[in-house]
Amino acid sequence: NDEGVVFTFNKEFSYVYPMNAAGVKGIEGTITVELGGMLRLLPQDNMSTKTVGNAQGFRSVKYSVYGKYPYGVEQDSLLVRWRLQIPKDKKKNYNRGQKVLPENPLVFYVEQSFPDRWFPYIVKAVRYWNKVFEGIGYKDALLVRKLENDVSSVTPKALIAYDLSDPVVANNLIFHPATGEILHCRINIGHGLWKEERERYYLLNGLDDNGSFIDFDSQKMAGELLCRVLSEEIGQVLGLQTIESKSAKEDL
């Protein structure tokens, strides 16, 4: 890979379930677990830094400045952000108010294990943020594609994964400590997302729903729920701080 070195470990585990009743043989078998990783090279040309200043609601990295004052240390913070730049040959168009494609659009790859029926809702969640970027002059700043079967899930800069082992939704970022440039992000959508959100909705709005409960078993409703949750996670990996929702009913 041009950006680093990819490596994988495969480990095989054996298991045996004891007999549940006399004369009944226990279940046994093996399972192979693959652990992947990637050593990435930092960019040779550092992205320009941007201090937080009066900006509110953005993720940041704190650092200490030594030597500026003879008897003290100054604390400051850099905004955490992706490197989305305007191509040099399109700057005139951009200055005229035309929407332009960024030099390197951010591509969200969807892991192979993600069920196909949810892919349209993932696309919808990503395109929601494109409307935001259009407000600052970018066109199609975010793209979404399915990860090919022969490509390791550790290689994309932005990955949306389907987690069968963990019911929660989570994300993580890796960024350049000196510039705040985001280098990699991963969003995990837990298999238990819908069960958790159903319980949350009933807990917050059960008495106010007047008997017209939302049909969580509907694929359309489940897809719209995924779209909402995923759009919030995308906002966080784009550099926004977490915003807690006040009402599950308002969300849906």
Predicted regions mapped to residue ranges:
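Post-HExxH zinc-binding segment in Zn-dependent metallohydrolases
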Residues: 252
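Catalytic Zn2+-binding segment of zinc metalloproteases
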Residues: 234-248
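Divalent metal-coordination and catalytic microenvironments
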Residues: 129, 180, 239
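Auxiliary tRNA-acceptor-end handling modules of aminoacyl-tRNA synthetases
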Residues: 1-114, 132, 147-222, 226, ...
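Zn2+-dependent metallopeptidase catalytic core
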Residues: 115-141
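Short, well-structured beta-strand/strand-turn elements
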Residues: 132-148, 241-245
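Hydrophobic face of alpha-helices
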Residues: 123-126, 227, 231
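Low-complexity, glycine/serine/threonine/alanine-rich intrinsically disordered linker
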Residues: 101-102, 123, 236
